[in-house]
Amino acid sequence: MGQTVTTPLSLTLDHWSEVRARAHNQGVEVRKKKWITLCKAEWVMMNVGWPREGTFSLDNISQVKKKIFAPGPHGHPDQVPYITTWRSLATDPPSWVRPFLPPPKPPTPLPQPLSPQPSAPLTSSLYPVVPKPDPPKPPVLPPDPSSPLIDLLTEEPPPYPGGHGPPPSGPRTPAASPIVSRLRERRENPAEESQALPLREGPNNRPQYWPFSASDLYNWKSHNPPFSQDPVALTNLIESILVTHQPTWDDCQQLLQALLTGEERQRVLLEARKQVPGEDGRPTQLPNVIDETFPLT
């Protein structure tokens, strides 16, 4: 009597109850007839190296899985339970599968280090050799004449303007938000720039103004969610920047330009117009005061 050759497919059929139990544990159902058809015909015709007798090779299983999970009309969602169960048997094999697992691949040998090339012999010269200076490296960002950013390594930052005398005493008004306070100061003193500037300590402990660097803006934008996704997180970030950097009006515009889309900036502008303080410190309804502080154009 001839001997029967055991293959991965025949092995799964001999242990079909365990195969169905494995599929059930993953929340799917498999049928024996379709299991055989997929293994002996459908997956073979995918031309990814799947053998008719089946295999527990993860490489072959992964190739078939890519075809099955392909988006659109090229995918085969009805075959997902079957390839998922095949992969489960290969990655977490029961005792009857282990003898049929392919041998592990040998580790890739490390490349041999290249032998150093002999250096060219030094030639005699009557004159000393003067090393050539390294060519200047191109800037990371192209220069923009209209940009307020400065090269922090080559330019001396402008000195911080001197302080003013104490404000005259008067009746106290309700405190406004940091943004509105700065905008109100700008409206009341149009001939002067805001004195709340991004500060750093310079020579002789003298405060100096430093505008936002390109890396600051890039890091804030790349490490925080968009305003449309998480407005609270981005609002907290901007409020912390206002406290720690004390930016000018132009700095605020640059910050909003980097962190918000055009539509988001328009929404922020419309909301800010509702909070423009009047002479009593409360939101005003006077159109001329609102337009002077927050023009729409």
UniProtKB/Swiss-Prot annotation:
Keywords: Capsid protein, Host cell membrane, Host membrane, Host-virus interaction, Lipoprotein, Membrane, Myristate, RNA-binding, Viral budding, Viral budding via the host ESCRT complexes, Viral matrix protein, Viral release from host cell, Virion. Residues 100-119, 130-146, 156-171 have a biased composition (Pro residues). InterPro entries: G_retro_matrix, G_retro_matrix_sf, Gag_p12, Gag_P30, Retrov_capsid_N, Retroviral_Gag-Pol_poly, Retrovr_matrix. Residues 97-207, 276-297 are annotated as: Disordered. A motif (LYPX(n)L motif) lies at residues 126-130. One of its GO terms (biological process) is viral budding via host ESCRT complex. The record marks 127-128, 197-198 as: Cleavage. GO terms for molecular function: RNA binding; structural constituent of virion. A motif (PPXY motif) lies at residues 157-160. Signal peptide: none annotated. It comes from the Viruses. One of its GO terms (cellular component) is viral capsid. A motif (PTAP/PSAP motif) lies at residues 118-121. The keyword Lipoprotein applies. A lipid is attached at residue 2 (N-myristoyl glycine). Residues 120-129 have a biased composition (Low complexity). This protein is synthesized as a Gag-Fes polyprotein. This is Gag polyprotein. It comes from Feline sarcoma virus (strain Snyder-Theilen). The lineage of its organism: Viruses, Riboviria, Pararnavirae, Artverviricota, Revtraviricetes. The gene is gag.
